[in-house]
Amino acid sequence: MTCEIMLTVAMGKRLIARGLMADTQVADAMRYHKLLIIGGSTNGYVAEEALRALGDGRAFDKRGFRRGVTAAPGAQMQAKPCGFDMLIDHGCVRTDGDVFSLINDMGQGDMVMKGANALYLPDGEAGVLIGHPQGGTVIPTIAAHIGRRVNLVVPVGLEKRVEAPIMRLAAISNAACADGPRMCPLPGRVYTELDAIAALTGAQAVLLAAGGALGAEGCVWLAVSGTDEQIAGVRALVKELSGEPATEL
Protein backbone atom coordinates (compact mmCIF):
# COMPACT_ATOMS: atom_id res chain seq x y z
CA MET A 1 0.00 0.00 0.00
CA THR A 2 1.21 3.52 -0.79
CA CYS A 3 0.04 6.84 0.62
CA GLU A 4 1.18 10.37 -0.15
CA ILE A 5 1.93 12.80 2.66
CA MET A 6 2.94 16.44 2.87
CA LEU A 7 5.44 17.74 5.40
CA THR A 8 6.18 21.39 6.07
CA VAL A 9 9.77 22.30 6.90
CA ALA A 10 8.95 22.49 10.61
CA MET A 11 7.13 19.14 10.52
CA GLY A 12 10.18 17.66 8.83
CA LYS A 13 12.51 18.98 11.51
CA ARG A 14 10.35 17.52 14.27
CA LEU A 15 10.12 14.21 12.39
CA ILE A 16 13.89 14.00 11.99
CA ALA A 17 14.38 14.70 15.69
CA ARG A 18 11.93 12.00 16.74
CA GLY A 19 13.44 9.52 14.33
CA LEU A 20 16.89 10.12 15.75
CA MET A 21 15.64 9.43 19.26
CA ALA A 22 14.45 6.02 18.01
CA ASP A 23 17.88 5.24 16.54
CA THR A 24 19.84 2.67 18.54
CA GLN A 25 23.22 4.29 17.87
CA VAL A 26 21.94 7.66 19.08
CA ALA A 27 20.33 6.15 22.17
CA ASP A 28 23.55 4.29 22.96
CA ALA A 29 25.64 7.46 22.60
CA MET A 30 23.27 9.46 24.83
CA ARG A 31 23.15 6.97 27.68
CA TYR A 32 26.52 5.21 27.60
CA HIS A 33 28.88 7.64 25.86
CA LYS A 34 28.76 11.30 24.85
CA LEU A 35 26.47 13.01 22.35
CA LEU A 36 27.27 16.57 21.31
CA ILE A 37 24.47 18.46 19.54
CA ILE A 38 25.82 21.54 17.77
CA GLY A 39 23.48 24.52 17.58
CA GLY A 40 21.32 24.81 14.45
CA SER A 41 17.68 25.14 13.48
CA THR A 42 17.11 21.41 12.97
CA ASN A 43 19.30 20.48 15.91
CA GLY A 44 17.14 22.67 18.15
CA TYR A 45 14.37 20.13 17.60
CA VAL A 46 16.84 17.30 18.20
CA ALA A 47 17.90 18.87 21.50
CA GLU A 48 14.25 19.25 22.56
CA GLU A 49 13.50 15.62 21.80
CA ALA A 50 16.69 14.48 23.53
CA LEU A 51 15.68 16.30 26.72
CA ARG A 52 12.25 14.71 26.50
CA ALA A 53 13.74 11.24 25.95
CA LEU A 54 15.95 11.66 29.01
CA GLY A 55 13.09 12.97 31.16
CA ASP A 56 14.96 16.25 31.64
CA GLY A 57 12.38 18.98 32.24
CA ARG A 58 14.72 21.96 32.18
CA ALA A 59 13.69 25.09 30.30
CA PHE A 60 15.14 25.12 26.79
CA ASP A 61 14.40 27.67 24.08
CA LYS A 62 15.35 26.20 20.73
CA ARG A 63 14.96 29.60 19.06
CA GLY A 64 18.39 30.67 20.30
CA PHE A 65 20.05 27.31 19.68
CA ARG A 66 21.67 28.29 16.42
CA ARG A 67 24.78 29.39 14.56
CA GLY A 68 24.55 30.99 11.14
CA VAL A 69 21.02 31.40 9.82
CA THR A 70 19.56 31.70 6.34
CA ALA A 71 16.52 33.96 6.73
CA ALA A 72 14.35 36.09 4.48
CA PRO A 73 15.51 39.68 3.84
CA GLY A 74 14.36 41.91 6.69
CA ALA A 75 13.46 39.01 8.99
CA GLN A 76 13.90 39.69 12.71
CA MET A 77 15.20 37.08 15.12
CA GLN A 78 13.01 36.55 18.18
CA ALA A 79 15.75 35.26 20.48
CA LYS A 80 19.45 35.93 20.98
CA PRO A 81 21.89 33.07 20.30
CA CYS A 82 22.24 30.96 23.44
CA GLY A 83 26.01 30.61 23.05
CA PHE A 84 26.23 26.92 23.94
CA ASP A 85 26.10 23.53 22.29
CA MET A 86 24.37 20.69 24.15
CA LEU A 87 26.46 17.83 25.49
CA ILE A 88 24.79 14.70 26.82
CA ASP A 89 27.40 12.82 28.84
CA HIS A 90 26.25 9.34 29.93
CA GLY A 91 22.67 10.60 30.22
CA CYS A 92 23.55 13.88 31.95
CA VAL A 93 22.89 17.12 30.05
CA ARG A 94 25.43 19.94 30.00
CA THR A 95 24.90 23.41 28.54
CA ASP A 96 28.06 25.05 29.88
CA GLY A 97 30.27 24.86 26.81
CA ASP A 98 30.49 24.80 23.04
CA VAL A 99 31.95 22.51 20.41
CA PHE A 100 35.35 24.18 20.65
CA SER A 101 35.70 23.48 24.38
CA LEU A 102 33.93 20.12 24.50
CA ILE A 103 34.80 18.06 21.44
CA ASN A 104 38.49 17.57 22.22
CA ASP A 105 37.51 15.25 25.08
CA MET A 106 35.41 13.04 22.81
CA GLY A 107 36.56 9.83 21.18
CA GLN A 108 35.52 6.50 19.69
CA GLY A 109 31.98 5.56 20.73
CA ASP A 110 30.93 9.19 21.13
CA MET A 111 28.76 11.06 18.64
CA VAL A 112 28.44 14.60 17.33
CA MET A 113 25.50 16.02 15.37
CA LYS A 114 26.01 18.87 12.92
CA GLY A 115 23.35 20.26 10.57
CA ALA A 116 23.81 21.00 6.88
CA ASN A 117 22.74 23.41 4.14
CA ALA A 118 22.95 21.14 1.11
CA LEU A 119 21.74 17.58 0.55
CA TYR A 120 22.52 15.42 -2.47
CA LEU A 121 20.10 12.55 -2.04
CA PRO A 122 21.39 10.16 -4.75
CA ASP A 123 24.67 9.64 -2.90
CA GLY A 124 23.55 10.51 0.64
CA GLU A 125 25.91 13.48 0.77
CA ALA A 126 25.62 16.73 2.72
CA GLY A 127 27.49 20.01 2.78
CA VAL A 128 27.50 22.99 5.11
CA LEU A 129 27.96 26.66 4.28
CA ILE A 130 30.92 28.34 5.96
CA GLY A 131 30.88 31.99 6.94
CA HIS A 132 33.77 32.10 9.42
CA PRO A 133 37.25 32.64 7.94
CA GLN A 134 38.66 29.84 10.12
CA GLY A 135 35.93 27.38 9.15
CA GLY A 136 33.61 27.71 12.15
CA THR A 137 32.25 24.69 14.01
CA VAL A 138 32.74 22.29 11.12
CA ILE A 139 36.54 22.15 11.43
CA PRO A 140 36.73 20.68 14.97
CA THR A 141 33.77 18.45 14.09
CA ILE A 142 35.50 16.87 11.11
CA ALA A 143 38.79 16.66 13.02
CA ALA A 144 37.07 14.63 15.75
CA HIS A 145 35.33 12.39 13.22
CA ILE A 146 38.41 11.64 11.12
CA GLY A 147 41.08 11.92 13.80
CA ARG A 148 39.38 10.13 16.71
CA ARG A 149 36.49 8.23 15.07
CA VAL A 150 33.79 10.24 16.80
CA ASN A 151 30.57 9.31 14.98
CA LEU A 152 29.21 12.19 12.92
CA VAL A 153 25.48 12.35 12.20
CA VAL A 154 24.08 15.05 9.91
CA PRO A 155 20.37 15.79 10.45
CA VAL A 156 19.17 17.61 7.32
CA GLY A 157 15.77 18.28 5.78
CA LEU A 158 14.76 17.39 2.25
CA GLU A 159 14.10 21.06 1.49
CA LYS A 160 17.90 21.43 1.27
CA ARG A 161 18.30 19.03 -1.64
CA VAL A 162 20.63 20.05 -4.48
CA GLU A 163 21.15 18.75 -8.00
CA ALA A 164 24.89 18.03 -8.10
CA PRO A 165 27.37 16.11 -5.95
CA ILE A 166 28.54 18.05 -2.91
CA MET A 167 32.22 17.95 -3.89
CA ARG A 168 31.38 19.59 -7.21
CA LEU A 169 29.37 22.32 -5.49
CA ALA A 170 32.12 22.87 -2.93
CA ALA A 171 34.64 23.35 -5.73
CA ILE A 172 32.42 26.08 -7.19
CA SER A 173 31.78 27.77 -3.86
CA ASN A 174 35.39 27.65 -2.68
CA ALA A 175 36.99 28.88 -5.91
CA ALA A 176 39.21 31.93 -5.61
CA CYS A 177 36.92 33.86 -7.96
CA ALA A 178 33.77 33.14 -5.91
CA ASP A 179 32.02 35.50 -3.51
CA GLY A 180 29.82 34.70 -0.49
CA PRO A 181 29.91 31.76 1.93
CA ARG A 182 32.11 28.77 1.30
CA MET A 183 31.01 25.12 1.41
CA CYS A 184 32.48 22.14 3.24
CA PRO A 185 31.42 18.54 2.52
CA LEU A 186 30.40 16.64 5.66
CA PRO A 187 31.70 13.05 5.80
CA GLY A 188 29.19 11.71 8.33
CA ARG A 189 25.93 9.77 8.24
CA VAL A 190 23.18 11.85 6.64
CA TYR A 191 19.76 11.57 8.31
CA THR A 192 16.59 12.90 6.63
CA GLU A 193 12.83 12.58 6.92
CA LEU A 194 13.08 9.41 4.82
CA ASP A 195 15.24 7.76 7.47
CA ALA A 196 12.95 8.95 10.24
CA ILE A 197 9.85 7.46 8.62
CA ALA A 198 11.61 4.12 8.24
CA ALA A 199 12.79 4.21 11.86
CA LEU A 200 9.42 5.17 13.34
CA THR A 201 7.04 3.15 11.17
CA GLY A 202 9.02 0.63 9.10
CA ALA A 203 7.59 2.12 5.88
CA GLN A 204 9.74 3.28 2.96
CA ALA A 205 9.39 6.81 1.59
CA VAL A 206 10.56 8.56 -1.57
CA LEU A 207 10.49 12.23 -2.48
CA LEU A 208 7.59 12.84 -4.83
CA ALA A 209 7.19 16.62 -5.16
CA ALA A 210 7.95 19.81 -3.30
CA GLY A 211 7.00 23.42 -2.70
CA GLY A 212 3.91 25.25 -1.56
CA ALA A 213 2.53 28.51 -0.18
CA LEU A 214 0.74 29.95 2.86
CA GLY A 215 3.21 28.41 5.29
CA ALA A 216 4.06 25.40 3.15
CA GLU A 217 7.00 27.05 1.39
CA GLY A 218 9.77 24.46 1.17
CA CYS A 219 7.39 21.61 1.95
CA VAL A 220 7.84 18.13 0.51
CA TRP A 221 5.43 15.51 -0.75
CA LEU A 222 6.49 11.94 -0.01
CA ALA A 223 5.17 8.67 -1.39
CA VAL A 224 5.26 6.18 1.46
CA SER A 225 4.93 2.44 0.90
CA GLY A 226 4.40 -0.33 3.42
CA THR A 227 1.97 -2.75 4.99
CA ASP A 228 -1.49 -1.60 6.05
CA GLU A 229 -0.26 -1.42 9.63
CA GLN A 230 2.79 0.63 8.67
CA ILE A 231 0.74 3.06 6.60
CA ALA A 232 -1.70 3.47 9.48
CA GLY A 233 1.31 4.37 11.62
CA VAL A 234 2.46 6.89 9.02
CA ARG A 235 -0.95 8.55 8.90
CA ALA A 236 -1.09 8.75 12.70
CA LEU A 237 2.41 10.23 12.79
CA VAL A 238 1.59 12.90 10.21
CA LYS A 239 -1.60 13.79 12.07
CA GLU A 240 0.44 14.28 15.23
CA LEU A 241 3.03 16.40 13.41
CA SER A 242 0.44 18.54 11.64
CA GLY A 243 0.14 20.87 14.61
CA GLU A 244 3.84 21.79 14.51
CA PRO A 245 4.15 25.60 14.27
CA ALA A 246 6.53 27.28 11.84
CA THR A 247 10.14 27.46 12.99
CA GLU A 248 11.05 30.59 14.96
CA LEU A 249 14.54 31.80 15.74
What are these model-derived regions, one by one?
Residues 28-64:
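N-terminal low-complexity or amphipathic/hydrophobic leaders
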Residues 2-26, 76-248:
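Conserved phosphate- and dinucleotide-binding cores of soluble alpha/beta proteins
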Residues 50-90:
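A phosphate-binding glycine/aspartate-rich beta-alpha loop in the early core of alpha/beta enzymes
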